[in-house]
Amino acid sequence: MTSSFKEQKDRAIEYADARGISIDFARQLGYGNDGIVWVTDEFTAVKAFLRQSNYSRELGCYQRLENLGIGEVGTFEIPSLVDSDAKLLIIEMTLVTAPFLLDFGKAYLDQPPDYTPEVLADWEAERRELFGNRWPQVLEALGWLRSYGIYYYDAKPGNITFGDES
């Protein structure tokens, strides 16, 4: 399922109405290839996904972390799952403050993707450059996620934030 901004917003409204909450559409927290994220009046975030595959991956990761009682990896806080709706492709999660790690729509559960060693080396070199001297902290967090069976490949500023970026 792919959808337009209007369709995502309509699904978010339907979700909010069913839950008895309001979404502040003026407070968009994020927008990307996976979907759009808005703030609710319950101080949670609602993410409307573009595709079923990203919804399923992200939901699976949040459920795994919840079942393990994990709310942070390394020094990074992770949102907790509040609710979800598979028909509407919506996930509601807690708001987090930096330092945080979020956006699991491109993560893999229990099995890493079948990338060649060259692709992985290029990916790591790009991330090392993006994060600079902070890369060891990011690498530690990714190691923790792997120990929980989550292979996270959307490491970029914005998804992994330290809180002192200027």
Residue ranges and their predicted role:
Residues 7, 13-15, 52-53, 59, ...:
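Nucleotide/phosphate-binding site architecture used for ATP/NTP-dependent chemistry
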Residues 44-45, 51-53, 87, 96-99, ...:
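Short, solvent-exposed loop/turn segments at secondary-structure junctions
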Residues 128-138, 143-149:
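Intrinsically disordered, low-complexity regulatory segments of kinases
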Residues 39-40, 48, 83, 92-95, ...:
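Conserved hydrophobic "DFG−1" position in protein kinase catalytic cores
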Residues 73-135:
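Conserved structural core of kinase catalytic domains
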Residues 25-71:
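ATP-binding glycine-rich loop module of kinase domains
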